[in-house]
Amino acid sequence: VQLMNDKLGVFRHQKIGAQYAYKPQLLGGTLSLGVQVSLLMESLDGTQLDAGQGNDPALPTTQVTGNGVDFALGAYYMRGNLYVGLSAQHLTSPVITLGDKYELPISPTYYLTGGYNIKLRNPFVTIKPSALLRTDGSSYRADVTTRVVYTHEKRVLYAGLGYSPTISVTGMIGGSFHGIIIGYSYEMYTSAIK
């Protein structure tokens, strides 16, 4: 089960999803093939928008909400300390109707990731550098991230930094508590939001 709550400016993106993965052994490693079905809930707080003088009919003046069904697929392969993954979200290209007259089209997004887990002399600490490339077919974004992960007797804590060239720097912390993974990240933009 996946729960997500993300706020960016006047938008709030929420998702609840169910996932399933099949994990066969392949070439000395593990291949994970996954599928996800989700309910997307989107809202836009029009009371926070400044349309300047007069009213712009293209912008709502109240809070508007809508929802839609979404579908995703992914494949992930891990062998030893090396991993690589490929996935696609929003394969149904949902169009969320916000209120009575506003539409939010959501394009499919494709991801390619890879990384390596570096074991240190301290058996409880691992450094995990990784890279992520994502595209919706018209634009792309690349991120490089390094996390330091502490693992001991089912306890997992992590902290890390991420960098997206010309876009942002991200800090993150989190851990596993009673089998539930909880994390927080903050992204600081280094250029104007596009």
Regions found by a protein language model. Name each.
Residues 1-194:
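Subset of outer-membrane beta-barrel
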